Structures are given as C-alpha cells and as structure tokens.
C-alpha cells in the first residue's frame, strides 16, 4: 500500500483539516514500530512537516496487501485524538491496535527463524 492511499482512506473515515505532511508523520510512527519488529531499517519521511503545503513522497509502506487496514485505522484513531473526540478515539484505538497486533503476529508466523532443534528448558 502506498502512503497517500492510506491517508486518503483515513480521510474517507474521518474528514479533517490536518495537513497531509502531518498525517504522513503520524503514519511514520506506526511504520517505525513495524520496521523495528521486522528488523528492517525504518523509512524516513522526506518532507518538512511544519510546511502544511509541502508535498509528500508517495512511498510504499512495509505491510503487505492483506494487512493494509492497519494504516488507515491507526491514522483514523490518531485523527480522533487530534479532534479531541475521546469516545471515538477509545474505540478506534482498540480496533487499530488489534489490527496491528494481528498483522505483526502474521508476520512473525510467516518469517519465523529456522529451528535448530536445540531446546532449553
């Protein structure tokens, strides 16, 4: 999934006035968490988030297509926090965390290290 598509999907869920660079910065927090779990280098955002008119590079996000919902659910929850809508934030945050946990569990299952047969008890 591309970053700008995740932002558009979140905007469809929660119309807001937050600038695209700031939304990209919010998504990078989740992307760094995912990169750390994967053991990959975390991508960097090449835009000045203070400049609300700056264009954001449309980079590919780390999670594959089956787990794209993590990004727009997480961003929607953060938009609820930004809008100070605590009731929606609590629900959306729980849903987003569940989606991220499922995606991370899937990744760990699919990318498990080869067992050497040595067990320590």
Where would I find each of the regions flagged by the language model?
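Short loop/turn elements at secondary-structure junctions
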Residues: 15-21, 66-68, 72-121
């Amino acid at each position: 999934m591309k970053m700008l598509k995740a932002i558009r999907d979140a905007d469809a869920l929660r119309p807001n006035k937050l600038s695209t660079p700031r939304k990209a910065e919010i998504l990078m927090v989740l992307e760094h968490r995912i990169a750390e779990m994967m053991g990959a280098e975390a991508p960097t955002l090449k835009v000045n988030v203070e400049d609300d008119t700056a264009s954001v590079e449309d980079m590919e996000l780390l999670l594959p297509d089956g787990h794209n919902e993590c990004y727009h659910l997480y961003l929607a929850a953060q938009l609820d926090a930004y809008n100070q809508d605590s009731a929606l934030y609590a629900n959306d945050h729980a849903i987003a965390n569940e989606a991220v946990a499922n995606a991370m569990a899937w990744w760990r299952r699919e990318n498990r290290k080869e067992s050497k047969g040595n067990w320590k008890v």
